[in-house]
Amino acid sequence: MRIIGIDPGLARVGYGIIEIENERKILLDCGVIETGKDKKEEDRLYEIFQDLNELINHWKPTVAAVEKFFFYRSSTTISVVQARGVIMMVLASKKIHVSEYSPAKIKLTIAGSGKASKKDILDAVMYNLDLDKPPKPDDSADALAIALTKLNEDGFN
């Protein structure tokens, strides 16, 4: 099983790809898709579309886990929702099953508390993937936490 975890955003889309091999979780790749603030929004969305397609074509994940988005009173809300729509469209076009998780569910599953801190999440990601140093940037660590939530749900603790 190979999973891609995705932390949606317009400026930065975090991603993390994990493979299960002999009941071990192996980190294959993690990082961010960054879009330039100087570009028009439609160009930024297209960049997410292209880069995510390339990632999926290269790594060929069989399932995906994406953070659910909750509406906040913020000027970036619509942009993030649009980026998330592009992400969901790419995954659907590749026939990849998607599981969605709220931030509280991710924190509870990974760190044992729905109110866990960023450091708690980072420590749990490092522990679960047997990493010596934290994944950078934070968006990629968040994406790995999202992927680990799905794996935990599927019984790969």
Curated annotation (Swiss-Prot):
Binds 2 Mg(2+) ion per subunit. Keywords: Cytoplasm, DNA damage, DNA recombination, DNA repair, DNA-binding, Endonuclease, Hydrolase, Magnesium, Metal-binding, Nuclease. InterPro entries: RNaseH-like_sf (IPR012337), RNaseH_sf (IPR036397), X-over_junc_endoDNase_RuvC (IPR002176). It catalyses: Endonucleolytic cleavage at a junction such as a reciprocal single-stranded crossover between two homologous DNA duplexes (Holliday junction). CDD domains: RuvC. Mg(2+) 2 binds at E67. The RuvA-RuvB-RuvC complex processes Holliday junction (HJ) DNA during genetic recombination and DNA repair. Endonuclease that resolves HJ intermediates. Cleaves cruciform DNA by making single-stranded nicks across the HJ at symmetrical positions within the homologous arms, yielding a 5'-phosphate and a 3'-hydroxyl group; requires a central core of homology in the junction. The consensus cleavage sequence is 5'-(A/T)TT(C/G)-3'. Cleavage occurs on the 3'-side of the TT dinucleotide at the point of strand exchange. This is Crossover junction endodeoxyribonuclease RuvC. It comes from Prochlorococcus marinus (strain AS9601). The gene is ruvC.
